[in-house]
């Protein structure tokens, strides 16, 4: 998309293994859908490339891509946002793609994978995930006792992370209870440091779950 070489080792990749049913439920309550996205952005300090689960607003076109449908969102300097949605799996779409490749081979059409010959691709510095600036969803499982939320908020404050919302379900005193927080936009490095401090709290009984929130 940017006429640059793809530096595969620098692509940040996460799967969906850490996503649980609770996260899907809370995402819905918060007005989001969870999608596994591949994201590439060009910034002044390099090319950002990452693949991981995201929360996206339920009203976004990309949130409606379910089942065999895939979606691509492209944003340009003058065209603003352009959405492409279509079937990406199933007998018909797969057969069509294979047939198109066979026809290109038969005709001798050589279309570069990235739109231009590999020798003409430019080199660009990768932009590390630590520089991402955005909002976050954080789910904790904690012992329900006084002061826990204050300790969590203090850890976030220590790393310049501002809270946007907090959800907590009532349980019997002493039981473990899920606590869900969303943050305002902050840098990934700050969020990572805050989560590490929160995970070390005695009242936190499971590894914190973090999902990035993307606006499309």
Regions found by a protein language model. Give the residues of each.
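Substrate-binding/catalytic subdomain of NAD(P)-dependent oxidoreductase enzymes
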Residues: 1-64, 69-71
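Short acidic (Asp/Glu) and glycine-rich catalytic loops that position anionic groups and cofactors
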Residues: 2-7, 75-82, 132-133
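Glycine-rich phosphate/pyrophosphate-binding beta-alpha loops
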Residues: 80-82, 86-92
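A glycine- and small/hydrophobic-rich beta-loop-beta segment
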Residues: 71, 77-79, 108, 113
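A conserved regulatory-domain signal marking ACT and ACT-like small-molecule sensing domains
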Residues: 97, 102-216
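Structured core elements
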Residues: 35-36, 50, 73, 83-85, ...
């Amino acid at each position: 998309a940017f006429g640059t070489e793809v530096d595969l080792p620098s692509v940040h990749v996460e799967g969906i293994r850490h996503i649980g049913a609770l996260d899907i439920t809370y995402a819905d309550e918060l007005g989001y859908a969870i999608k596994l996205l591949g994201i590439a952005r060009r910034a002044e300090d390099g090319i950002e490339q990452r693949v991981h689960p995201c929360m996206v607003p339920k009203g976004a076109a990309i949130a409606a891509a379910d089942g065999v449908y895939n979606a691509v969102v492209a944003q340009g300097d003058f065209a603003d946002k352009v959405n492409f949605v279509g079937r990406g799996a199933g007998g018909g779409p797969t057969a069509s793609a294979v047939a198109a490749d066979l026809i290109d081979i038969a005709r001798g059409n050589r279309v570069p994978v990235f739109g231009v010959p590999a020798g003409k691709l430019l080199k660009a510095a990768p932009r590390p995930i630590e520089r991402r600036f955005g909002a976050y969803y954080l789910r904790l499982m904690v012992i329900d006792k006084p002061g826990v939320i204050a300790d969590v908020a203090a850890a976030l404050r220590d790393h310049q992370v501002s809270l946007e919302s907090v959800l907590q379900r009532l349980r019997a005193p002493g039981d473990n209870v899920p606590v869900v927080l969303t943050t305002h936009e902050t840098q990934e490095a700050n969020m990572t440091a805050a989560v590490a401090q929160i995970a070390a709290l005695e009242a936190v009984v499971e590894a914190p779950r973090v999902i990035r929130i993307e606006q499309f």
